[in-house]
Structures are given as structure tokens and as C-alpha cells.
């Protein structure tokens, strides 16, 4: 504490010295000491009087003093001397003016040109006018010459004096103006210096007063510390007023002493802190504005750093979410539904009119899936580049939720399908066995079939789309009847899988890879699950054929298709418009391919039963007919009854055959190449399935 007092005293001495220097500068500039106080009488004289201060009142007072002779004798002498001096100066000025008046008048007065004017003489009326004129003429030559010269000389002299006077006056005015400007500048400079000095003096005085207060406070604090240092050895009572005492014997008293010392030390420390804060506040008054600006800058920097840290944390979080989403997609085997997940989940199921059209639609769906996969990979790459943006976190969370929903829906559909497949076997044995005949279109070498059979088969295949359209026009069932309808067997897609076992024996299969006719009775899942299976991995796409029974090949091909209007759900009714557009585009292709396949079906079936053209077909048919002979009669009766109903509309389709024959020829070539690929891919899988289980197992990927 003593050190603080010394430093404050040193600062106080320095401030006093600087104040003295400022006072000396003011004394030099103004001629008086700023610390001196003016006499009270001078102030009273200046303030009293009729004029009320300066001006005429002061002059009247001075006159009264000089006239009355009042006041102190020293003042009287000064006033008399001043008056005499002023009076003497005035007299000398007047005398000098009187002496120099003529000259000054010549200089100051404007020069006038003198002119001699002849006075008119009084003419007597007695003499005539012409006599007077004659006398004038006589007198003019007698005029003396020196008078005219004197006049001219005076005039010229006046003119010269006037010009000289004007030049002198101009020079004098210029000099006076320069002097006035210089005097004004000096006066302003003196005023500025004086103002600056007085401002500096005020600042020094305030600093001096502040230092004096600090020194005084420091001295008081030091005295207080000395006093408390003496008291600290004693015990302070808890009650007020506090008393300090010390016991004669120290029993438990040392504890009390320590506690008292601790409290007093805390009190001292608090007092020291308050003292330091007070001094800092006194020093920080001029710097308050600058400190506020610095604090504001620090706050702004901290906010910027926090925002940068938050942005840096968000980017890794988005990367982690994207990785988790990719893992889920890899487990399920479906493409990640980035951005367009809602569209893929809400994909509507098209209406299947015939097996040929269904195969064509499945191929189109595969192409669409490939295009979507490519688009989603591009979206993935673009989103990986934008991982640093915090907005992607919400998108990723939504995507993960959508993927989980899709997985849950698929699992529910699978469990429902397993439950529906078992009762469908019993129902299939009781109901009519649908028969569906497909055959690969023969090569150019195998085109020696009868035209009558071809026409009949084409008419049967063309009747199929019309029957489907008639069934679609029927009213949709209520939503409550959907679970019952979905439990019924649907043989069409499974027949596709069954028909894939024999396409390898031909060199030129049709565009849709339709194999030889095999009437099947298969428990088929509902079309919703078939549409879902397009997104599932191959392990979940397999369906076991529950009962496959081959019948004898009939002489006339029969085509039976169950109406699927009972199995349509609300989503399928919404998609009817889209399905019609899609089927109308592919109707020409499917009808031509179906007609050609049906014609080839009848010929190949006849040839297989009579001549045994294909050893593989005959072997498979002979092995399968032994197990299915019990149901031949029922299937033949049902097929004949259904063929009768279809034969009614054959007359309407004859006109279509001529129009579609041209399209069929064009698409034969493109369909051959496609069927080669599908036949090669499906043959190896079918052979494994037949050899392992005895019954063929088919996958939707072969369609």
C-alpha cells in the first residue's frame, strides 16, 4: 500500500510542474498571471453606473473621478497625467491638421478645370450695337500674352498634382489592407494559443484534483490497515457492536482466533478489491468509449468462431447419416430413395391384360429401374459434394425414415403372402385349372405349318385384350372385399416362370421369349407383391411352384385367363388411366407377338404329340403327365367352356389381324435378339432348379 501512495504522490508532483509551465505560457501571452484575482473595486466600478457596465458608464465615472477629485491620491495623479497626456496629444494633432490642411485639401479635393468667363458689360442704350462690336474687335489684339500663359500653367499644375495624389492614395490603401490582414491573422493566432493554453490548464487542474483524491484515499486506506493490523490479534464478538477481546488462558480460544482472523482477512480483501475498482473506475472514465468498442469486437469474434465450429460439426454429421443410409440400402438390395423416394413408394400397379403384355411391361419396368438407378447415383454424387451444407441433415433423416418404411412394408407383404400361398393350394385343386398355351415362334425352317391353325390361334390371342377391357369396365369391388380376393390363385405370372424352362431348344425365339404351352395350376401371389418384388433382391423373388400338372396337348389351342378385376385395389383403380395408355401403346406389339406365338403353339404342340420333334419337350411332358392324369378331364371341360365364350368375339378381331400383321413382321427381328439373351440366362437356372427339387423353380428376373 505504501508503494501505491508513493507512486500517486510522484504523479501529483509531475502534474503540478506541468500546470506551472502552462501558467507561465499564459503569462507570457496575456501579460498577467492567470492565478491572480482582479481587485474587487475594479469589478464594482465596471459593474456600477448608469451605463450598466462597459461603455459610456465607465467614461462618466472616470469624468466624475477627475472632476470631483475623489478617490485615492495615487489614482488622481494617474488620471490627471493621463488626461493631460491625452489633451496634449489632441492639441498637437489639431495643430498639425491645421498646418497641413491646405496641402491635404489640394490632395484630397477633386481637381476642377478653371475657366475664364467674361463678364457682360452694361451697354448704354444711346450707342448702337454695332459700335460696341467694333470696339471689341479693336480690343482683342491688344490682350496681353502672359496672362494666358499663367492660366495654362496653373491648369497643368493642378492636373499633375491630382494624378500624383491618386497614385499615392492607391499605394497607401494597399499597404493599409495588408497591415489589416496581417493584424487579423496575428490576433486570431493569439486567441487560438490562448484558448489552447487555458484548455490545457483546465485539463491539468482536473488531473491534479483527481491525483489529490487518490493520494488522500491511499493515505486513509493505509491508516485503516495499520489500525486493523493491531486489532487482528484479538477475538471479535459475533454480536454487534463488535468487541475485540483476548482471554487470559487459551483453551478453545485459538480456534476462535483463527476464525476471527479469517473473517477479518476476508473483510480486508473485500475492501482492497473495492478500493482497486474505485481507482480503476476513476481512471477509466475517459477510456470508456474505446473499451466498449473493444468489447463489442470481442463479442463479434466469439460469435463468428461459434458459427464456424457449428458449421464444421454439421458436415461430418451429414456424412455419417449418408453412410448409414447406404448401409441400409445395401442390406435391403433396393436403390436408395434419395429425393424421389416418395415417387418410388407410390408407384402404381398397372393392369395386366395378357401374359405377353405383362412381360413387355416388366421389361419396360426394368429399363425404368435402370434409368432411375443411374439418376440416383448422379444425385448421390451431387449430394456428397454438398455434404457441408447443414440443410442436408433433414433430407437424410427423411430418406432413412422412408427406407425403413419401405422395408417394413415389404416384410409385411412377405408374411401375408406366405399365409396366402398355403390356402391357395387347396382352392386351386377344387377350382378349375386354368390353361395357358405359349410357344416360341419357329424359325424360317419351321414355318411349314398350316395357315388355318395360325389364323385360329391368332384370333384366340387377339380375343384376350378385348376380354380384359370388358372385365375392366365392370365395377370395382368394395375395399372390404380386397383381402378375400387377394387370397385367390392368380396363375398368369407363375406360368411365365414355368414357360422359361424350354426356350433353349430353338434358334429363333419370339420377342417375348414365350415357351411351349404348359397348362399349369400354380398358387400365385397378388399383383401388388409382384410389383414390389421388382425392388427386392433375387433371394426374395423366388417362388416355389406348389403343383405343376401337365395335361395332354389338345388339338385346338385354348387360352384361359382369369379376371383380375376382383383383385384390384384402390391404388390399381387410380392407375387405370396410366395402364390404359401404356397398354394402348404396347397393344399392337403384344397382339402381333401373341398371335404368332399362338399359331406356333398349335403347330409345335401338334408336332410334339405326333412326331416328337423335340426330345427335351417329350421327355418333360411324359414325366409330368404321369402325375397329372387325374385332373385332365376337369381341365379339358373348363377349357372348352371358356373357349366357347371367347369364340364369340372372334369375328370382331378378324379386321385387326390384317392391320397388325405388318407390325408383327417388323418386330419379329428385334424380338429374336431379346429372346436369345433371356433364353440363355434362364436355361442354366431352370436346369439347376429341376435337378435339385424335381419341380421347376422360377424367378421373376427371367421374364
Swiss-Prot record:
Which positions does the record annotate as the modified residue N6-acetyllysine?
240
UniProt modified residues of type Omega-N-methylarginine: 54
Q: Does the record carry Transcription as a key word?
A: yes
Per the record, the major location class is: nucleus
Subcellular location(s) per record = Nucleus speckle; Cell junction, Desmosome
Q: Where is this region: Disordered?
A: 46-148, 284-314, 331-394, 408-703
What family does the Swiss-Prot or TrEMBL record give for this protein?
Belongs to the pinin family.
Q: Which organism does this record belong to?
A: Bos taurus (Bovine)
Q: Write one Gene Ontology MF term.
A: DNA binding
Q: Keywords on this record?
A: Acetylation, Activator, Cell junction, Coiled coil, DNA-binding, Isopeptide bond, Methylation, mRNA processing, mRNA splicing, Nucleus, Phosphoprotein, Spliceosome, Transcription, Transcription regulation, Ubl conjugation
GO CC annotations on file: catalytic step 2 spliceosome; desmosome; nuclear speck
Which residues are annotated as modified residue Phosphothreonine in the UniProt record? Answer: 125
Basic and acidic residues biased stretches: 87-100, 348-357, 366-386, 417-433, 665-676
Question: Which portions of the sequence form the region Sufficient for PSAP complex assembly?
Answer: 223-285
Q: Quaternary structure?
A: Found in a mRNA splicing-dependent exon junction complex (EJC). Found in a complex with SR proteins. Found in a mRNP complex with RNPS1. Component of the PSAP complex consisting of RNPS1, SAP18 and PNN. Interacts with PNISR, CTBP1, CTBP2, KRT8, KRT18, KRT19, PS1D/PNO40, PPIG, RNPS1, SFRS4 and SRRM2. Identified in the spliceosome C complex.
Coiled-coil-forming residues are 2-32, 165-236, 354-411
The biased composition feature labelled Low complexity covers 479-489, 589-642
PANTHER family for the chain:
PININ (PTHR12707:SF0), PINN (PTHR12707)
Q: Cross-link Glycyl lysine isopeptide (Lys-Gly) (interchain with G-Cter in SUMO2) - where?
A: 109, 121, 138, 157, 159, 230, 281, 306, 313, 366, 372, 541, 549, 566
Name of this protein: Pinin
Amino acid at each position: 500500500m505504501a508503494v501505491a501512495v508513493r507512486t500517486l504522490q510522484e504523479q501529483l508532483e509531475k502534474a503540478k510542474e506541468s500546470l506551472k509551465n502552462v501558467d507561465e505560457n499564459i503569462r507570457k501571452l496575456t501579460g498577467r498571471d492567470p492565478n491572480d484575482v482582479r481587485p474587487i473595486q475594479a469589478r464594482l466600478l465596471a459593474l456600477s453606473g448608469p451605463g450598466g457596465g462597459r461603455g459610456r458608464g465607465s467614461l462618466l465615472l472616470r469624468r466624475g473621478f477627475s472632476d470631483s477629485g475623489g478617490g485615492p491620491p495615487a489614482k488622481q495623479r494617474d488620471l490627471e497625467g493621463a488626461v493631460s497626456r491625452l489633451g496634449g496629444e489632441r492639441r498637437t494633432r489639431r495643430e498639425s491638421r491645421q498646418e497641413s490642411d491646405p496641402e491635404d485639401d489640394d490632395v484630397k479635393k477633386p481637381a476642377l478645370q478653371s475657366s475664364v468667363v467674361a463678364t457682360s458689360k452694361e451697354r448704354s442704350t444711346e450707342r448702337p450695337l454695332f459700335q460696341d462690336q467694333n470696339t471689341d474687335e479693336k480690343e482683342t489684339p491688344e490682350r496681353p500674352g502672359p496672362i494666358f500663359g499663367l492660366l495654362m500653367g496653373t491648369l497643368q499644375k493642378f492636373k499633375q498634382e491630382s494624378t500624383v495624389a491618386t497614385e499615392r492614395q492607391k499605394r497607401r490603401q494597399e499597404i493599409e489592407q495588408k497591415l489589416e490582414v496581417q493584424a487579423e491573422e496575428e490576433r486570431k493566432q493569439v486567441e487560438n494559443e490562448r484558448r489552447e493554453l487555458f484548455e490545457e490548464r483546465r485539463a491539468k487542474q482536473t488531473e491534479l484534483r483527481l491525483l489529490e483524491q487518490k493520494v488522500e484515499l491511499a493515505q486513509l486506506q493505509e491508516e485503516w490497515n495499520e489500525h486493523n493490523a493491531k486489532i487482528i490479534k484479538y477475538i471479535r464478538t459475533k454480536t454487534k457492536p463488535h468487541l475485540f477481546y483476548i482471554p487470559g488462558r487459551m483453551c478453545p480460544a485459538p480456534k476462535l482466533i483463527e476464525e476471527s482472523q479469517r473473517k477479518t482477512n476476508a473483510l480486508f480483501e473485500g475492501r482492497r478489491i473495492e478500493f482497486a475498482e474505485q481507482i480503476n473506475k476513476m481512471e477509466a472514465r475517459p477510456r470508456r468509449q474505446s473499451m466498449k468498442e473493444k468489447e463489442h469486437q470481442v463479442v463479434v469474434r466469439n460469435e463468428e468462431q461459434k458459427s464456424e465450429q457449428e458449421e464444421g460439426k454439421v458436415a461430418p454429421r451429414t456424412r455419417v447419416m449418408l453412410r448409414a443410409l447406404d448401409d441400409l440400402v445395401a442390406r435391403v438390395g433396393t436403390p436408395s430413395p434419395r429425393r424421389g423416394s416418395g415417387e418410388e413408394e407410390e408407384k402404381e400397379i398397372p393392369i395386366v391384360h395378357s401374359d405377353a403384355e405383362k412381360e413387355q411391361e416388366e421389361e419396360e419396368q426394368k429399363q425404368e429401374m435402370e434409368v432411375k438407378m443411374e439418376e440416383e447415383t448422379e444425385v448421390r454424387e451431387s449430394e456428397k459434394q454438398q455434404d457441408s451444407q447443414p440443410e442436408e441433415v433433414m433430407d437424410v433423416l427423411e430418406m432413412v425414415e422412408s427406407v425403413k418404411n419401405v422395408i417394413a412394408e415389404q416384410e409385411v407383404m412377405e408374411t401375408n403372402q406366405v399365409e396366402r400361398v398355403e390356402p391357395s393350394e387347396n382352392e386351386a385343386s377344387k377350382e378349375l385349372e386354368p390353361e395357358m398355351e405359349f410357344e416360341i415362334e419357329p424359325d424360317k425352317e419351321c414355318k411349314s405349318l398350316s395357315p388355318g391353325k395360325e389364323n385360329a390361334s391368332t384370333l384366340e390371342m387377339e380375343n384376350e385384350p378385348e376380354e380384359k377391357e370388358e372385365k375392366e369396365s365392370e365395377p370395382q369391388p368394395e375395399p372390404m372385399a380386397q383381402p378375400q380376393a387377394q387370397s385367390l390363385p392368380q396363375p398368369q405370372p407363375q406360368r411365365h416362370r414355368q414357360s422359361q424352362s424350354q426356350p433353349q431348344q430353338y434358334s429363333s425365339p419370339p420377342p417375348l421369349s414365350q415357351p411351349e404351352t404348359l397348362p399349369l395350376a400354380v398358387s400365385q401371389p397378388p399383383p401388388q407383391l409382384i410389383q414390389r418384388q421388382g425392388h427386392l433382391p433375387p433371394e426374395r423373388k423366388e417362388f416355389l411352384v406348389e403343383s405343376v400338372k401337365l395335361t395332354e396337348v389338345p388339338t385346338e389351342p385354348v387360352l384361359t385367363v382369369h379376371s383380375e378385376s376382383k383383385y384390384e385395389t384402390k391404388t390399381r383403380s387410380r392407375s387405370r388411366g396410366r395402364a390404359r395408355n401404356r397398354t394402348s401403346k404396347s397393344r399392337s406389339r403384344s397382339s402381333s407377338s401373341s398371335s404368332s406365338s399362338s399359331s406356333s403353339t398349335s403347330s409345335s404342340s401338334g408336332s410334339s404329340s405326333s412326331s416328337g420333334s423335340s426330345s427335351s419337350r417329350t421327355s418333360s411332358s411324359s414325366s409330368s403327365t404321369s402325375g397329372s392324369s387325374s385332373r385332365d378331364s376337369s381341365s379339358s371341360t373348363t377349357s372348352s367352356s371358356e373357349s366357347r365364350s371367347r369364340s364369340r368375339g372372334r369375328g370382331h378381331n378378324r379386321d385387326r389381324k390384317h392391320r397388325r400383321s405388318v407390325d408383327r413382321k417388323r418386330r419379329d427381328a428385334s424380338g429374336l435378339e431379346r429372346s436369345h439373351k433371356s433364353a440363355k440366362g434362364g436355361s442354366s437356372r431352370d436346369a439347376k432348379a429341376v435337378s435339385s427339387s424335381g419341380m421347376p423353380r422360377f424367378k421373376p428376373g427371367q421374364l
